[in-house]
C-alpha cells in the first residue's frame, strides 16, 4: 500500500470515513523518533514509519525531550472515525542507549500488565502484543544501527484511566491499556460494508479460477496456512467474525471445498452453532468446551476448571494437563457437522474441513488428516 491508500477515505452510505492508526503504530513511531533524537542530539518534530500492512505514516511528535543518552517522545493516538477508548491519548517512548548490542522493551506507567494466561504473552509482562513488539524493536534497530543497544520503555500517563473503558480487566490485563495492532491501521467500517468487502474478495478469488477456499478469522490464520500447511495463501480469505455469511457467499459463488482454519477461541463457537463469532453476539466458549469434554468422559474436576476459565488459552492448558487433547479433532468434526447442517437445503453443498491451531502455530486438531486436506487444496 502507498501513503495515498491511508489518506483515501472509507466510504459508507455516501459518507467519507477517515482511517486512523493503532496504539502499536504510535508506540513504534515514538520509539523510533526517541532513538533518533538521542543519536542526533536535537529535537525532531515529525517522524515516519511503515506499518505492517505497508502503509507509510508521517506523524507529528509531541513532548520531545533529550537528556544525555536518553530521549522521550510521544505520539497522539488517532483512531480516525473509529473512535475507541484510546483515541486522542498520548503514547510515550523513553529510549536509553547503551553498549550491550541488545534492545530491551518494557512497559511503564499506564501500560497494562498480563496477570492471567491466555492472551499470548508471558505472565507479568507488559501488554505489548507480538506485532507491535516486533515493529518497535525493528524501528529502534533501524535507527541505532546493528552494534548499539537500547532500553525502550513504552508508557501512557492516561493509560490506567482509559483502560477502565476497555475489556482489559476481564482478560487479566491490569493497570493500563494494551499496545496492539496487527496491521498498524484502523479502518472504520460498518458491519454490512465490512461483510461486503470480504465477499468481494471471495468473488475475485472465484473469478480467478479458484474452486477451493480457506476461510480464516484474521492474520494469524493466514500465517498458519503459509508456514505450517505449505499452501499458497492465494486461496485464503478473511472471514472475520462473519462465519455463516462467508460460508453462504462461498456456496453462492460455487466453491467446491471450504476449509475453516483458526484458533479454538474463534472456531469453537461454530461447534455450538454460532455463526457470528463476535463476543457481542454470543460467547459460550467454555460451555461448549465443557459439554464436549463431558461427552468424551472428562472428569468433573477438569470440567470445573475449564468452566471457570476466562480465556480459551487458559482452558487449553487444563485440557492438555489432563490428557484430553483429542477433543480438538472431535471439535473439528463437530464444526463441520454444524456447517453441513446449516447448508442442509443446499443442492450441492461443498466439502467442509476444519483445522484448529494454537497461538504457537501448532496443529491442535482437524476433522481429517491435515496433509490430506493440504494435498487437495494444492490440486
From Swiss-Prot:
Gene3D superfamilies (UniProt xref): CbiD-like
Output the PANTHER family linked to this UniProt entry.
COBALT-PRECORRIN-5B C(1)-METHYLTRANSFERASE (PTHR35863:SF1)
Q: What is its EC number?
A: 2.1.1.195
Keywords from the named record = Cobalamin biosynthesis, Methyltransferase, S-adenosyl-L-methionine, Transferase
Annotated pathway: Cofactor biosynthesis; adenosylcobalamin biosynthesis; cob(II)yrinate a,c-diamide from sirohydrochlorin (anaerobic route): step 6/10
Please give the Pfam families that the UniProt record associates with this protein: CbiD (PF01888)
Q: Which GO terms describe its molecular function?
A: cobalt-precorrin-5B C1-methyltransferase activity
| Swiss-Prot/TrEMBL catalytic activity | Co-precorrin-5B + S-adenosyl-L-methionine = Co-precorrin-6A + S-adenosyl-L-homocysteine
Q: What is this protein called?
A: Cobalt-precorrin-5B C(1)-methyltransferase
Give the UniProt record's GO annotations in the biological process aspect: anaerobic cobalamin biosynthetic process; methylation
**What residue stretch is flagged as signal peptide?**
none
Residues annotated as coiled-coil are none
Q: Which organism is it from?
A: Salmonella paratyphi C (strain RKS4594)
Please state which protein family the record places this protein in. Belongs to the CbiD family.
